[in-house]
Amino acid sequence: MNLVRETAPEGLNSLGLTLNTEKSYTWSSTAHGTELVYLGYAFKKIGGKADVSIAGKKINVIKTRLTKSFVRYAKDHNFDMLKMRVKFLTGNFTLYQADTLLPIRVGLFFNYKQATNTDCLDDLDKYYQKLLHCRTGKLGSHIAMSKLETKDLEKYSFRFGYENHVNHHFTTDQMDMITNCWL
């Protein structure tokens, strides 16, 4: 490991890059329960196996987007936009590269398909259901959704979208409208 620490800065410099020592650390995979977060995944050694899950920061980003979607709905009562935002977060969709029109599949499954532990999806589903059925408090009291609308949104699930690779279609304009409340 010392060899890496000694040679990495020199190798990076030759590429015109520098090592950010404030964000760099040595990870010991032998320490039980130690977690490495990299590229949206959390790697953890449990027993003799590696546990790969969606990183906590990414889960928090999804929860924040869900909350912001419901906050926007509480203000504008645009059910169709809320439904599109929920579909966007719980499912997958295809983008096309502008220059080649090659498809790029993105979304919950395609962004995290290397995860071996998907328990966090149940946590996301519980969080979503609490938001959906909340009728008290600062946010809940402003969500005036009919029973039919609530029932319509109940069918969306992070676990189902992930395991069944649920794919939705959104136009560019729709994606802009969906994501504008998360900025």
Show the residue positions of the predicted features.
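Right-hand nucleic-acid polymerase module
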Residues: 21, 30-183
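Conserved short beta-strand edge segments in small beta-sheet-based binding/regulatory domains
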Residues: 16-22
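Composition- and surface-driven signal marking solvent-exposed, interaction-prone regions
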Residues: 3-7, 17, 141-145
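Catalytic palm subdomain of template-directed nucleic-acid polymerases
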Residues: 1-13, 47
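A generic secondary-structure signal for well-formed alpha-helical elements
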Residues: 8-16, 132-139
